[in-house]
């Protein structure tokens, strides 16, 4: 049975959204957001599927990366810094098996930002969100809204 309504307040925000997208190279994708999935709280998952492999990550078990294969056994990679590529191993602050997650990602990003400020120069390939990144997200959101309003595919205009 369903619980009784706890409040008579009318909710006027979007509770669920689903977006279809396609890239210039023809590849397609989708994503969904929900504020009504009971028990999921702030869950964030990514899954990318290709013809030969898939990869999935779940914020509720952030120390694991699942890799699915078509022709061999699937894999679950763990977060052991000793096994990571040197480019990303510095972002792991604890030994393998200890959970690092959402707050750690922001700590790592801000650490990179502060190092750039201290150096007085923007890196060629910044490892933190830039104003350009934020603007790009806003252009994408604008295209999603226009697509919904016009009920057709809309190109993201930068």
Residue spans of the language-model regions?
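Short, small-residue-biased leader/transition segments that mark boundaries at the very start
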Residues: 1-7
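Residue-level marker of intrinsically disordered, low-complexity segments enriched
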Residues: 2, 74, 86, 138-139, ...
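NAD(P)-dinucleotide binding in Rossmann-like oxidoreductases
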Residues: 9-17, 22-108
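C-terminal helix-rich "cap/oligomerization" subdomain common to oxidoreductases
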Residues: 58-61, 98-101, 108-158
């Amino acid at each position: 049975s369903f619980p009784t309504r706890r409040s008579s307040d009318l909710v006027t925000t979007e509770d669920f959204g689903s977006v279809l997208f396609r890239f210039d190279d023809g590849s397609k994708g989708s994503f969904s957001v929900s504020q009504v999935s009971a028990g999921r709280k702030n869950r964030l998952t990514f899954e990318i599927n290709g013809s030969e492999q898939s990869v999935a990550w779940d914020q509720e078990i952030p120390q694991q990366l699942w890799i699915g294969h078509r022709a061999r056994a699937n894999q679950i990679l763990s977060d052991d810094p000793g096994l990571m590529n040197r480019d990303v191993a510095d972002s792991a602050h604890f030994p393998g098996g200890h959970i690092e997650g959402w707050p750690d990602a922001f700590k790592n990003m801000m650490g990179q930002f502060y190092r750039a400020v201290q150096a007085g120069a923007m890196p060629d390939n910044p490892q933190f969100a830039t104003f350009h990144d934020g603007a790009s997200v806003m252009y994408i959101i604008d295209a999603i809204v226009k697509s919904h309003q016009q009920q057709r595919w809309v190109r993201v205009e930068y």
